[in-house]
Amino acid sequence: LQKIVRKVNAAKPDIIFFTGDCFESPYNLNLRTLEPLKQLSAPIYFVAGNHDGYVGTDSVKALLRQVGVHVLETETVEDHGLQIVGLDYMRADEQDGNSMHAPVGDATIESVCKELIHKGDLPLVVLHHNPCGGQYLEKAGVDLYLAGHTHGGQLYPLIWINDRLFQFNRGLYRLGNMQAYTSCGSGTFGPPMRIGTRSEITVMEMKGK
């Protein structure tokens, strides 16, 4: 984590987004593990992923808050001229059977778009762990959709399978007027290796129209 923090700070970001899966094991679920996050040079916003649920989502959120991370729980904030919506882990809609893991609560991206996401004058950025429900977010006027979850497949042939499972498996996509980016993540799940994908720290520059 210390190495990741150094690389992030070297990019001199204005704001940092973390789209979940901070932990996959309870053995390192402690403040000492997260201490390097205090050194980040910009505000960081986090939404929880399914792996965080494996070790206890509430515990993960509590620890992250103690090191200064802004944890978003299906809510909207404004920072650095952006309207930022952070969603808890949820399905795309009531018919979504491809979430792969049990979602948190009854909310769906479709229902949240009707209740929470209201396009204003600021660029609208949505953070959600699973890159699903893009059609609802685009219709709601979202400018940028940031997600993770897929690890890009991590290992061949899972890359090929993921490309067919997920609407946005990895990298940059455009859906109507919305751009979506799914990060492969800076770590791994299970075996500490990748074949056909690379770990990443994504740097984006947003420009006004």
Residue ranges of predicted features:
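Soluble catalytic domains of enzymes that build or remodel membrane lipids, polysaccharides, and related
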Residues: 1-209
